[in-house]
Amino acid sequence: MKQIQDLTSIYARKKPAEFADNLCLFFCYNFCKGKIFKDEKEAFDAAEKARLDGFLGDDGFVLNAEAILREGNCFRWSVQKEKISAIGDVKKASPVCFEYNGRAHWVVVENGEIVFNSLENSVCVKNGKPVSMRIIRQLDL
């Protein structure tokens, strides 16, 4: 089965090609806050809204992680960057970046296992190494 990022590219034809290619961290943040898109149209519409709101760049890269996490709920969030070299110590669901040959892809890791990947097949995950993660904290309980 194709994953959500593979499918959203059909809606991105009028946008720069890299817009859909670079949405992996956006999808990871949504997964971490409990948002599961019902289909690729809903996912693309959410990404386009985030772009128009200034939370994503025209290239699909995340500009404001806290705002993406806050969208659709009343909580405030904190996101901290941390370098890593292995996923075994990642306990709480967190976006993790894998790099391979100058390319990067984000997945969600929990308890040392990948629990969400917006792509069906990622060369970065398959052949690359984890290099950084985002630690997400909900500030309002």
Spans of features found by a protein language model:
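Short intrinsically disordered terminal tails
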Residues: 1, 140-141
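Active-site-adjacent structural segments surrounding the nucleophilic cysteine of cysteine proteases
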Residues: 1-55
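Conserved active-site-adjacent core of cysteine acyl-enzyme catalytic domains
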Residues: 33-140
